[in-house]
A protein has these predicted regions:
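Short alpha-helical scaffolding segments that buttress acidic/His motifs in well-ordered protein cores
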Residues: 31, 116, 188, 214-218
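Short glycine-rich loop/turn motifs
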Residues: 160-162, 185, 272
Length: 272
């Protein structure tokens, strides 16, 4: 994993573009309150937390927050599975019988509240050094991670040009490299706007097939053409052009699925 950049990025925006009418502590107070005292979760969150019980049990910090009313019975079930006393199917069934989250239940995250308090009080140093940094490094050491104290101290965010495109006359403004998401988003929209999506029933065979094929093409390009602009010249104008989208679409058949192994990245004409 990379060094967490959201904290530094948001603080940079606050510093560069904030009105100056509020302190950082004032702005962060509501988030701290929600983390410390809790808030009611919706049904989607409840279902999501319950579906990842087995994964959360692999990490003590996650388990105590996202498994409802965790107790020794749950830990005993996990240990029985680790010892080979339960099959994968039996393990899943026992976890499914554990008390589950319901819509409206209160989610409390005390550790997150403490982290937010340190950031609110000390800014970047409240995350990239001091107590929070120590906790991150402890986690790295315990789980063979790669982030070092020096990585945290040297991190700084930079402004990048956004990716701009259109979809049926709607303007798209998204993130630019090193994130690949913005370029792929525009590229995929460029491809699917050549189809009458309204005529397709949502989640129908035709609908899912088209989205799958479009994503296959886009991700093949991502693997070859996109990277950190400080080290790799990504052909953004080509990837986000309407003409390139039509060229890539010629590889799609609406009658059969393409094997992912048969999909190659498009030719980078800017290198010629």
């Amino acid at each position: 994993s990379g060094v967490p950049g959201t904290v530094n990025g948001l603080l940079k925006i606050f510093s560069d573009y904030g009105s100056g009418n509020f302190t950082l502590e004032e702005i962060m107070a509501p988030a701290i309150d929600y983390a410390e005292n809790g808030y009611p979760i919706n049904g989607v969150a409840a279902q999501g937390f319950d579906s990842y019980k087995a994964l959360f049990l692999n990490d003590e910090g996650s388990a105590k927050i996202f498994i409802k009313d965790i107790n020794n019975d749950i830990l005993d079930i996990q240990q029985a599975f680790i010892n080979g006393e339960l099959s994968q199917d039996e393990y899943g069934k026992k976890l499914a019988n554990i008390d589950e989250w319901q819509e409206g239940d209160i989610l409390i995250q005390k550790d997150l509240a403490n982290t937010l308090k340190r950031i609110a009080k000390n800014g970047n140093s409240g995350f990239y050094s001091g107590k929070t940094a120590e906790l991150i490094i402890q986690e790295m050491v315990a789980n063979n991670g790669f982030i070092t104290k020096e990585d945290l101290l040297s991190y700084h965010s930079v402004y990048r040009d956004p990716i701009i495109g259109t979809y049926r006359n709607n303007l798209i403004i998204s993130m630019g490299p090193p994130s690949s998401g913005g370029a792929l988003l525009v590229q995929m929209f460029n491809m699917i706007e050549n189809f009458d999506m309204k005529s397709m029933e949502r989640n129908s065979t035709e609908f899912v097939h088209l989205l799958t094929e479009v994503q296959r093409l886009a991700y093949a390009d991502r693997a070859i053409h996109l990277g950190d602009p400080d080290f790799w010249p990504s052909p953004i104008p080509m990837l986000t052009s309407k003409e390139y989208a039509k060229e890539r679409l010629s590889l799609i058949s609406m009658n059969s699925a393409t094997r992912s192994t048969e999909i190659a990245a498009g030719k980078n004409l800017s290198k010629e």
